[in-house]
Amino acid sequence: MRQRLLPSVTSLLLVALLFPGSSQARHVNHSATEALGELRERAPGQGTNGFQLLRHAVKRDLLPPRTPPYQVHISHQEARGPSFKICVGFLGPRWARGCSTGNEKYHLPYAARDLQTFFLPFW
């Protein structure tokens, strides 16, 4: 008798493990059906357009409102763009965002760098 029950019990356990959500199906969230009923009472459906309006209204009621994305405050210097300097170092003149003290020659603003009309003299 025990050997006959063992395969059926194991198969039942396998089915229960494969479908875990079926045991929770008895608990139904009635807020969606209540919202649907209220919308039907307010405005009876007019064909497919009424159904679409009803469906979107129910979705709007169920989902929480989205928060706007985090806004980053940019300073005036960063909004204008980076400024570059010409530094004279061991290997000669070069572009850089910052120079060590004593080797800064010219300060080149961002707009002049974009125009590419700057002539780099050889020292």
UniProtKB/Swiss-Prot annotation:
It comes from the Eukaryota. The keyword Signal applies. One of its GO terms (cellular component) is extracellular region. It is found in: Secreted. Residues 1-25 form the signal peptide. Has antimicrobial activity against E.coli. Plays a role in the defense response in the male reproductive tract, contributing to sperm maturation, storage and protection. This is Sperm-associated antigen 11A. It comes from Homo sapiens. The lineage of its organism: Eukaryota, Metazoa, Chordata, Craniata, Vertebrata. The gene is SPAG11A.
